[in-house]
Amino acid sequence: GIHPYIDRIINEVHKLTEKGFIHDEHIKAEKYQYMDELVTTINEYNDILALWIKMKQGSLSLNIETFGLNELFDLIRKGSRAFEMKQQQLEVTPTDTYVKADKALTLFMINTLAENARKYTPKGGKVKVYANPTEEYVEISVEDTGYGLSEEDVTRIVGEKLYNSQEIGILDAADREELLKNKGSGFGLMNCKGIIEKYRKTNEVFRVCLFNVESTLGKGSRFYFRLPKSE
């Protein structure tokens, strides 16, 4: 839920006021940036729920356009503070590829996968965001050096329309308490799959659309999706 993010904002405000950081312009700027990212995360969480409701009601509409992926990658790069707080490295590889899709939903999907990677990757880990173009489609990947998933969990995430996210990874977790603390609703990934399904039902151009996961326990995961390539 959003409560941990609200608690973090309160904690940052406390540091600014009670610890005297308000007088240090450099620290103050860093704190403001971090709080801004936390507020953005809360808004994104609300967007996830709203999107889920729309998909369940069958009222989700697609605004298809041609756009450059690098514009979205730049936005992802600006959210690096949350990764730095966990001593993680966020690596976003620039790309000159263009896709035909809904821009807002594409950003939502990349954001969702990057946030999941951040949550389930330990301190000192790396999260990579990159795009690989082919003749027909562009494959957008979010790869991490996190805890990884079992084959059974990957099958559930990819194959089941609705699953209990609290059960994913729990049997293989070295620290179950830490894993459960990071758990969300699971709606983010379900929304990503739902968006891809919506594309595939739209017209023949989107037959290349796909959502998939590759993972190795103890080594990390790669979540990826495909969108039609455009010139």
Q: Each predicted region: which residue ranges?
A:
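Glycine-rich ATP-binding loops of the HATPase_c
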Residues: 176-179, 197-214
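Short beta-strand/loop element within the Bergerat-fold HATPase_c
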Residues: 124-136
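Acidic ATP/Mg2+-coordinating residue in the GHKL
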Residues: 144
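Short alpha-helical segment of the dimerization/phosphotransfer core of two-component systems
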Residues: 34-45
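Short helix N-cap motif at coil->helix boundaries in the Bergerat
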Residues: 69, 148-159
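Short helix-loop "hinge" at the ATP-lid/N-box region of the Bergerat-fold HATPase_c
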Residues: 117-118
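Short conserved segments within the C-terminal catalytic ATPase subdomain
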Residues: 82-92
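Conserved micro-motifs of the catalytic ATP-binding
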Residues: 57-62, 94, 98-101
